[in-house]
């Protein structure tokens, strides 16, 4: 089957399923695969949010309830579609191929790769999370800005160098985002679900799962005695991923302790 590396919207409208089935990321050919895209978007993101903070300094907050409700519901549903687009094919693939292949030589085309690609583009759309916070004049945590800035680079690098275990990272992130954006959607409706704290717990578990998959990748890649000798991807990309994931893990644990553990200790003292 001949792969396609570009999304021709005319062809896509005529045969969306066939287009997705034949899709495969190709460096410098697939739209926005060039390194200029993450450079412009990530540094443009920093310039925009800090410029907006200066602009909003002496202005009243902008509520944005209607837009924020749509934004969060859209990302919740998109995350669900991407999650299913990766997990269902990978589950079918895993039974005959085993653990080594799903970590080192997973599906590299079709719905899984198309879902990766949409996930990559969605990281730019998610910059709107920060824009909403700035327009509402809420303080920005380093964790928030770092997460949005570096995740685009993380996804781009893993797509470019085709890291075998990236499906674990992406599907885990999609699952967490289903829960997280549904929570934010509910809060925009005036409902405050009781399980807010557990979102951070899920995020911490996500990074532990991510690191486990990368450790498995490193283990298999050092063996050199499998079907194709080595895992798909590079050590440099995996090391970069390890650094980013560990930074997220540390920052989210720090946030959890500050936001929830200290609050519970204060409550105990007042009681």
Swiss-Prot record:
Give the membrane topology. Multi-pass membrane protein
Classification via InterPro entries: ELO_fam
Chief place of localization: membrane
Question: Per UniProt, what is one GO molecular function of this protein?
Answer: fatty acid elongase activity
The UniProt record describes its induction as:
Down-regulated by Pseudomonas aeruginosa, PAO1 strain and PA14 strain infection.
State its Enzyme Commission number(s).
2.3.1.199
Q: Enumerate the catalysed reactions.
A: a very-long-chain acyl-CoA + malonyl-CoA + H(+) = a very-long-chain 3-oxoacyl-CoA + CO2 + CoA
Is Plastid a UniProt keyword of this protein?
A: no
TM spans, by residue?
A: 35-55, 68-88, 102-122, 139-159, 165-185, 198-220, 237-257
Its GO CC terms are: endoplasmic reticulum; endoplasmic reticulum membrane
Q: Does the keyword Lipid metabolism apply?
A: yes
Q: Tell me the keywords, alphabetical order.
A: Fatty acid biosynthesis, Fatty acid metabolism, Lipid biosynthesis, Lipid metabolism, Membrane, Transferase, Transmembrane, Transmembrane helix
In which compartments does the protein localize? Membrane
Biological processes annotated in GO: fatty acid elongation, monounsaturated fatty acid; fatty acid elongation, polyunsaturated fatty acid; fatty acid elongation, saturated fatty acid; sphingolipid biosynthetic process; very long-chain fatty acid biosynthetic process
Q: What class of enzyme is it?
A: transferase
Q: Which PANTHER family match?
A: ELONGATION OF FATTY ACIDS PROTEIN 1-RELATED, FATTY ACID ACYL TRANSFERASE-RELATED
Q: Which family does it belong to?
A: Belongs to the ELO family.
**Function field:** Fatty acid elongase with strict substrate specificity for monounsaturated fatty acids, in particular 16:1 (delta-9) to produce the unusual 18:1 (delta-11) fatty acid.
Q: Report the protein name in the record.
A: Fatty acid elongase A
């Amino acid at each position: 089957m001949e792969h396609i590396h570009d999304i021709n919207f005319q062809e896509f409208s005529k045969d969306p399923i066939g287009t997705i089935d034949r899709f495969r990321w190709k460096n410098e050919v697939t739209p926005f695969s060039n390194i200029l895209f993450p450079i412009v978007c990530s540094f443009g993101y920093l310039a925009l949010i800090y410029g907006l903070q200066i602009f909003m300094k002496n202005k009243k907050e902008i509520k944005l309830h209607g837009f924020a409700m749509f934004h969060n519901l859209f990302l919740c549903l998109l995350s669900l579609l991407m999650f299913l687009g990766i997990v269902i094919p990978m589950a079918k693939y895993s039974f005959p191929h085993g653990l080594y292949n799903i970590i080192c030589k997973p599906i590299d085309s079709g719905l899984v790769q198309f879902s990766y690609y949409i996930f990559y583009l969605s990281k730019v759309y998610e910059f709107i999370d920060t824009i909403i916070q700035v327009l509402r004049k809420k303080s920005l945590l380093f964790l928030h800005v770092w997460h949005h800035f570096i995740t685009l680079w993380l996804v781009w690098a893993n797509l470019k160098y085709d890291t075998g275990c990236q499906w674990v990272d992406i599907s885990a992130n999609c699952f967490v985002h289903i829960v997280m954006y549904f929570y934010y959607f509910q809060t925009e409706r005036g409902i405050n679900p009781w399980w807010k704290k557990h979102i951070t717990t899920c995020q911490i578990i996500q990074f532990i799962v991510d690191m486990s998959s990368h450790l498995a990748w490193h283990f298999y890649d050092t063996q050199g005695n499998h079907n194709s000798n080595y895992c798909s991807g590079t050590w440099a990309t995996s090391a970069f991923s390890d650094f980013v994931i560990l930074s997220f893990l540390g920052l989210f644990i720090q946030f959890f302790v500050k936001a929830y553990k200290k609050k519970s200790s204060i409550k105990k003292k007042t009681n």
